[in-house]
Amino acid sequence: MAPIKTQESINQKLALVVKSGKFTLGYKSTIKSLRQGKSKLIIIAANTPVLRKSELEYYAMLSKTKVYYFQGGNNELGTAVGKLFRVGVVSVLDAGDSDILTALA
C-alpha cells in the first residue's frame, strides 16, 4: 500500500506527532536540533525565505535528516500543528504513534 501524500493526511500525521511525539517549532530550535543530530525530519513551509531554507537544507544534509516541503504557507503549517501563530519550520524529534517518518520518505 503506497502512502497517499495529500495535504489532509499530512495534517493528520502532524497532529498525531503533536499529541504523541516530540517536536520543536521555529528556525533557531530546528537548527539546534539538527546540529545535535536529534532531528529525524524537518518540515519547511512554502513561504520560508530562500536564505533560511537553504541554511536548513545544508544542516539537514550534514546530519542526514529528511526534509519535507509543506505545500501551504507558515499560517497553514501553524494551524496544522495546532498553534494559533505562524510556524515556518517544524522539526520532528520523535514521531510517537505517527507514521510520518515512513510516509514522507
UniProtKB/Swiss-Prot annotation:
Q: What keywords are assigned to this protein?
A: Ribonucleoprotein, Ribosomal protein
Gene Ontology biological process terms, A to Z: negative regulation of mRNA splicing, via spliceosome; rRNA processing
Task: Output the Gene Ontology cellular-component terms.
Answer: cytosolic large ribosomal subunit; extracellular region; fungal biofilm matrix
Tell me the InterPro entries matching this sequence: Ribosomal_eL30-like (IPR039109), Ribosomal_eL30-like_sf (IPR029064), Ribosomal_eL30_CS (IPR022991), Ribosomal_eL8/eL30/eS12/Gad45 (IPR004038)
Note the SS bond partners. Answer: none
What are the GO MF terms of this UniProt record?
A: pre-mRNA 5'-splice site binding; structural constituent of ribosome
PANTHER family, from UniProt?
RIBOSOMAL PROTEIN L30
| Family recorded in the similarity comment | Belongs to the eukaryotic ribosomal protein eL30 family.
NCBIfam families recorded: PRK01018.1 (NF002172)
Its protein name is Large ribosomal subunit protein eL30
